[in-house]
């Protein structure tokens, strides 16, 4: 799991925001918990990367409620807003102990991009914001609305109904050295970053941390991504640790091809192997366990399902469900009716194929983008847009490739990312 997701704020106390913003959020939460909110919706607006969505999830964590998230794209037109958002916001869960209390937090992300079109072929109409205005007036559950461009949203029909019935909080970018809050922000971010690095067992010089913060502020997610890349690129995993990981996944793969599911689950729950790494190993070694076409088809369908679930978990950030894809892949033996009975030694996936879906490749790509960013005087996130250029140049100009390798001091994994 990437550090930015692993250490996402869980409560409003974890947010790195000004005390003014924190107090406004807390007042809105208190009003809900007292059962008498005058404004049932909360609008969080500000530039992209300012922490609005993270704040929404932290607010839900403070409530102790799950999040129902809707991204306001082309699929969020009038009918879908009416069928999904209105139902979710008006009615408590069937299993709720008290129907008068909120049961969830409704998150409508990027509301300034709510799709509105009179063209029925594109599935749109002009009532998306109107339906949203009804939701914020009538909801029985807290509604959080995020938007990048508050003033663009104000131009939409019925937007005033939404705004007037919502508490609005601006996530302002700091004016760097001219703003005393920026120094406080930088101090808090630096302390959080040092804590994360220590938790992960890495170390990083203060000058690199400060440089990363200055280049990415106020986008904390980008800061953490670049810090992770820098920390990993400066550290080496010992041969013993590599061996332990291989032995652990080898053991799990062996279990997956044996019909003792309870034993397999115990091994999965006691392992620290990543889900994508495990699935990659199982997929690579499946043909060695059966050559029956029907068996292979059934087994690969299950692996595809596990991979899809893994994608959904990462997309929705439900990381407490990370073992679910492994549970699916771990039962593969029950889809193989005609197994090979001879002993076969499992082998690891090919280097590039393994990296393409593993944490190792993500770390390598992050490390490369950070190094390119330092070379070009931009953030690692921005420099990702230029990786394709380096890949192309390496293919047509060996001299350029050798110079870049020397300047960036790339590891073998980082070279593989640029040559793939």
Swiss-Prot record:
The keyword Ribonucleoprotein does not apply. The keyword Nucleotide-binding applies. SUPFAM superfamilies: P-loop containing nucleoside triphosphate hydrolases. InterPro entries: AAA+_ATPase, ATPase_AAA_core, P-loop_NTPase, Rep_factor-C_lsu, RFC_lid. Heteromultimer composed of small subunits (RfcS) and large subunits (RfcL). Belongs to the activator 1 small subunits family. RfcL subfamily. This is Replication factor C large subunit. It comes from Thermoplasma volcanium (strain ATCC 51530 / DSM 4299 / JCM 9571 / NBRC 15438 / GSS1).
């Amino acid at each position: 799991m990437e550090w930015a997701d692993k250490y996402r704020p869980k409560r409003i106390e974890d947010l790195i925001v000004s005390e003014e913003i924190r107090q406004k959020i807390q007042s809105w939460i208190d009003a809900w918990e007292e059962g008498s909110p005058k404004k049932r919706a909360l609008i969080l607006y500000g530039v992209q990367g300012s922490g609005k969505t993270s704040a929404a999830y932290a607010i839900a964590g403070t409530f102790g409620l799950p999040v129902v998230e809707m991204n306001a794209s082309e699929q969020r037109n009038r009918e879908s807003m009416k069928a999904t958002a209105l139902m979710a916001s008006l009615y408590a869960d069937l299993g709720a102990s008290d129907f008068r209390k909120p049961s969830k937090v409704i998150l409508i992300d990027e509301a300034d991009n709510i799709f509105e079109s009179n063209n029925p072929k594109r599935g749109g109409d002009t009532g998306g914001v109107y339906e949203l205005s009804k939701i914020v007036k009538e909801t029985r559950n807290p509604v959080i609305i995020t938007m990048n461009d508050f003033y663009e949203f104000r131009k939409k029909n019925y937007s005033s109904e939404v705004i007037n019935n919502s508490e609005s909080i601006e996530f302002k970018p700091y004016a760097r050295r001219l703003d005393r809050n920026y120094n406080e922000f930088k101090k808090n971010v630096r302390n959080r970053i040092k804590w994360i690095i220590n938790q992960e067992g890495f170390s990083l010089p203060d000058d690199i941390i400060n440089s990363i913060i200055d280049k990415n502020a106020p986008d904390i997610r980008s800061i953490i991504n670049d810090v992770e890349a820098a920390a990993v690129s400066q550290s080496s995993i010992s041969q013993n640790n590599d061996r332990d990981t291989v032995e652990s996944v080898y053991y799990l793969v062996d279990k997956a091809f044996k019909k003792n599911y309870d034993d397999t689950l115990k091994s999965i729950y006691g392992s620290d192997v990543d889900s994508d790494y495990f699935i990659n190993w199982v997929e690579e070694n499946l043909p060695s366990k059966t050559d029956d076409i029907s068996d292979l088809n059934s087994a690969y369908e299950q692996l595809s399902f596990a991979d899809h679930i893994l994608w959904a978990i990462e997309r929705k950030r439900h990381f407490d469900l990370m073992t679910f894809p492994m549970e699916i892949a771990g039962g593969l033996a029950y889809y193989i009716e005609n197994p090979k009975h001879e002993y076969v030694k499992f082998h690891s996936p090919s280097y590039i194929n393994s990296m393409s879906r593993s944490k190792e490749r993500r770390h390598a790509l992050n490390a490369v983008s950070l190094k390119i960013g330092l070379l070009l005087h931009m953030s690692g996130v921005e420099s990702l847009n230029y990786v394709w250029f380096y890949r192309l140049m390496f293919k047509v100009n060996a001299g350029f490739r050798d110079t870049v390798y020397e300047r960036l001091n790339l590891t073998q994994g980082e070279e593989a990312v640029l040559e793939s």
